[in-house]
Amino acid sequence: MGRAFVYVILGGGVAAGYAALEFTRRGVSDGELCIISEEPVAPYERPALSKGFLLPEAPARLPSFHTCVGANDEKLTPKWYKDHGIELVLGTRVKSVDVRRKTLLSSTGETISYKFLIIATGARALKLEEFGVEGSDAENVCYLRDLADANRLATVIQSSSNGNAVVIGGGYIGMECAASLVINKINVTMVFPEAHCMARLFTPKIASLYEDYYRAKGVKFIKGTVLTSFEFDSNKKVTAVNLKDGSHLPADLVVVGIGIRPNTSLFEGQLTIEKGGIKVNSRMQSSDSSVYAIGDVATFPVKLFGEMRRLEHVDSARKSARHAVSAIMDPIKTGDFDYLPFFYSRVFAFSWQFYGDPTGDVVHFGEYEDGKSFGAYWVKKGHLVGSFLEGGTKEEYETISKATQLKPAVTIDLEELEREGLGFAHTVVSQQKVPEVKDIPSAEMVKQSASVVMIKKPLYVWHAATGVVVAASVAAFAFWYGRRRRRW
């Protein structure tokens, strides 16, 4: 027995939900679209799992964070899918895919065929066993990738109040889970091999400010070392962790966040794999024209930097999903996916956003002493390529986004750039209007050339310099095509 659909989305994470919403808005007919997911629930916003889901009071629970509430859009409950004629095949694993025949075989033995396939399989959490450490199956060792993981972690947290937790990893999951554990009145020690937290993105100066705040909340840091083994009680529950530097840490709970690996195994040998993900073009189309890939599993061209990237963040998942559906449903009017890499996080009283690429010379600016509002620029080969801001307003975040998208030449020295701070970004934007990047660029969009910014007088955050006169053609373009870019 088998079923046939025009469109099949394989995977049930964030990207799948946003793709489904885009399909309905582009006129998909009842019965044409199917979503196949190993999870037993409809697509949901994964960021909630390390934040609201772990709160000790009034924690977030489904259906409150089904997609697409994370972008202030519709909440896609199971009823929504039914009302729109979308087939949800949940709790089902696909054990093989035949790209040439355009078929999928489920673990139940059902064959599902498609005309177009969107791969939204995401990624899996790396396990300690892959690094030679046994014991991940202990009841108080927790990962956090899906709803089942979150439920397990929440249960262990409830039984560990005033106890000791060891968080392995200093990235997104480690930092956000550590904050949640503190809120739950658990003593936290973070362990990671790098010199500072969020090493792939933060500079040492930025990291030190966040680490100092965490320390003030009682969090301890052990850096430059790794976990080597666990100690267990008679019930095979972890009681302590041993580190390579000889440290011995008591543990009632262990949270592991040591990275992810894209779920590409079904397509290896059938589609081109690059940088760990499925290689796609600027329309999110793989080496097979009927197969698209979106979200964490996709390696796509980032036009701003002229190279292939695989990005692990919810914003990329949301926007790549919309673009892939646009390319399938309206190929003539859909242009290239012109994505500006974007990362953000909210922990304790902090809220930061980053745009672009954290490479090149770093210039810090703002009020690092009080930790309320500060930022950084990354300058590579004389151009602005990355911007970070903590504690900004919505308008300030939009400004650094637009400035980074322009990739302007920096003609002032770095010391002056530090003094200018946010004023530099304001000047970039005021001197040259940016055709704001749409979630789904149209084929008619014209790529604007990089701007050159020359600043003669110091500026302050609240005083944007007077913009230069923009050519009439550019002004007309901005009028017709410019519209506010959504950041949430």
UniProtKB/Swiss-Prot annotation:
Its EC number is 1.6.5.4. Gene3D superfamilies: 3.30.390.30, FAD/NAD(P)-binding domain. The chain crosses the membrane at residues 4-24, 459-479. NAD(+) binds at residues 170-176, 194, 200, 259, 312-313, 344. It catalyses: 2 monodehydro-L-ascorbate radical + NADH + H(+) = 2 L-ascorbate + NAD(+). Its cofactor is FAD. It is found in: Peroxisome membrane. It is an enzyme of class 1 (oxidoreductase). Keywords: FAD, Flavoprotein, Membrane, NAD, NADP, Oxidoreductase, Peroxisome, Redox-active center, Transmembrane, Transmembrane helix. Residues 1-3, 480-488 are cytoplasmic. Residues 25-458 are peroxisomal. One of its GO terms (biological process) is hydrogen peroxide catabolic process. NADP(+) binds at residues 172-176, 200, 259, 312-313, 344. Changing residue 386 to Q: In sdp2-3; loss of ascorbate recycling. L-ascorbate binds at residues 318, 346. It is a multi-pass membrane protein. GO terms for cellular component: chloroplast envelope; peroxisomal membrane. The keyword Transmembrane applies. The C-terminal domain (451-488) is necessary and sufficient for peroxisomal targeting. Belongs to the FAD-dependent oxidoreductase family. Catalyzes the conversion of monodehydroascorbate to ascorbate, oxidizing NADH in the process. Involved in the detoxification of H(2)O(2) that escapes the peroxisome and causes oxidative damage to oil bodies. This is Monodehydroascorbate reductase 4, peroxisomal. The gene is MDAR4.
